[in-house]
């Protein structure tokens, strides 16, 4: 790194460290005040002040956003694979640990809900490690996704294609094609019987700074963490109804957004973390689909800062280039590996196989798929 650039980064790091110290002191003072006041918060009038809820301003996300701003100001916005030790790494880890001690935001299943497989997925909670060790089923090869799940007759015809996996949009209020006349448990089992693997996609609420005009009607609300958890539960319920068992990967679709807007980045990250934590707590693997230069780069920035509860699999869209899960410049070389990446390398193309024509996106896959029961 050039000397002038290094000085700029060191200056940013010093400023962020001071911010972290200030935030930690404030959180300690708040905890001391709550501990010294009689009564339990929320149970009687005059009770102690309640702890900061998960949807209040998040010091972890603030530190990440500040680190991103500093990197962009230094001209580091177009990195080709950031290395260790960048701004915000130690600060993000410290603040995350502090926050975890200050408030337990663990997902707690309600009556009738399951934790099936949650313990079994401990090996797959990080962004590295082979997910098969936790019981996931990994597919490596070509896949297509299309807005409407095709009929089983069309799937049978497409066995002559180079694809052996199909992405389907099975849930979420942001789906462009909410009506799926073929998609259901019978379809899932029929696809499996023909040798197809399934990549289930959940299109929930979208970032407030989403670029697509067609997604602005389903924005993340004022309580992103809580909303993310609620939609995570919905994703799990719908997966079970579609005959997808625990250890299945479920992919959250977050269309391209401007993560350099600090407030928007903070809100979007809180939603994604809430969704991912909840899906993971129920024994499923949380995956994430987005543009390589927006959502995927945002997740990489968060990973470098030591943030927890990130998605376990990364599905990045970068069109007009050859298929490769290993050469994405928005991800560090060792991040989300092994068997944790999907590259969508072409979109809105038309292909015909076995006399059946479909408009699809093309993907190269080395990642977990649905476990169909």
Task: Show the residue positions of the predicted features.
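Secretory targeting and sorting signals
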Residues: 1-35
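C-terminal region of N-terminal signal peptides and the immediate post-cleavage residues
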Residues: 22-67, 84, 116, 123
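Functionally critical loop-and-helix segments that line ligand-binding/catalytic clefts
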Residues: 58, 81-104, 110, 117-146, ...
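Substrate-binding cleft of extracellular glycoside hydrolase catalytic domains
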Residues: 135-161, 168-260, 264-269
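Short acidic/polar active-site loop segments enriched in Thr and Asp
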Residues: 164-166, 285
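Acidic, His- and aromatic-enriched active-site or binding-groove loops in soluble protein domains
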Residues: 220-231, 269-280, 305-327
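Aromatic-lined carbohydrate-recognition surfaces of secreted/lumenal glycan-active proteins
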Residues: 279-298
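Distinct, well-ordered alpha-helical segments
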Residues: 297-305
């Amino acid at each position: 790194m050039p000397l002038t650039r290094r000085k700029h980064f060191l200056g940013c790091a010093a400023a962020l460290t001071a911010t972290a110290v200030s935030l930690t002191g404030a959180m300690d003072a708040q905890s001391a005040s709550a501990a010294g006041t009689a009564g339990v918060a929320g149970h009687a009038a005059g009770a102690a002040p309640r702890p900061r809820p998960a949807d209040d301003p998040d010091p972890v996300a603030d530190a990440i956003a500040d680190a991103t701003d500093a990197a962009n100001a230094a001209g580091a916005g177009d990195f080709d694979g950031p290395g260790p030790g960048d701004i915000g790494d130690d600060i993000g880890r410290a603040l995350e640990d502090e926050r975890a001690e200050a408030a337990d935001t663990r997902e707690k299943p309600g009556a009738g809900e399951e934790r099936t497989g949650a313990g079994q997925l401990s090996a797959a909670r990080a962004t590295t490690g082979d997910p098969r060790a936790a019981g996931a089923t990994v597919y490596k090869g070509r896949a297509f996704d299309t807005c409407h799940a095709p009929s089983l007759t069309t799937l049978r015809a497409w066995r002559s294609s180079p694809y052996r996996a199909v992405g389907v949009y099975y849930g979420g209020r942001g789906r462009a094609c909410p009506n799926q006349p073929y998609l259901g448990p019978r379809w899932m089992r029929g696809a499996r019987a023909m040798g197809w693997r399934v990549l289930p996609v959940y299109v929930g609420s979208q970032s407030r700074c989403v670029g697509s005009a067609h997604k602005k009607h389903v924005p993340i609300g004022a309580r992103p963490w809580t909303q993310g958890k609620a939609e995570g539960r919905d994703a799990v319920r719908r997966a079970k109804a579609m005959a997808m068992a625990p250890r299945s990967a479920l992919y959250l679709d977050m269309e391209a957004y401007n993560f350099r807007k600090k407030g928007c980045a903070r809100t979007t990250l809180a939603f994604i973390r809430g969704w991912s934590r909840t899906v993971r707590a129920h024994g499923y693997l949380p995956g994430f689909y987005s543009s390589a230069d927006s959502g995927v780069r945002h997740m990489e920035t968060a990973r470098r800062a030591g943030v927890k509860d990130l998605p376990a699999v990364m599905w990045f869209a970068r069109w007009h280039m050859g298929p490769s899960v290993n050469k994405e410049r928005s991800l560090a070389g060792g991040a989300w590996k092994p068997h944790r990446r999907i590259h969508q390398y072409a979109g809105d193309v038309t292909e015909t196989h076995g006399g059946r024509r479909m408009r699809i996106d093309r993907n190269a896959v080395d990642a977990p798929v649905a476990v169909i029961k």
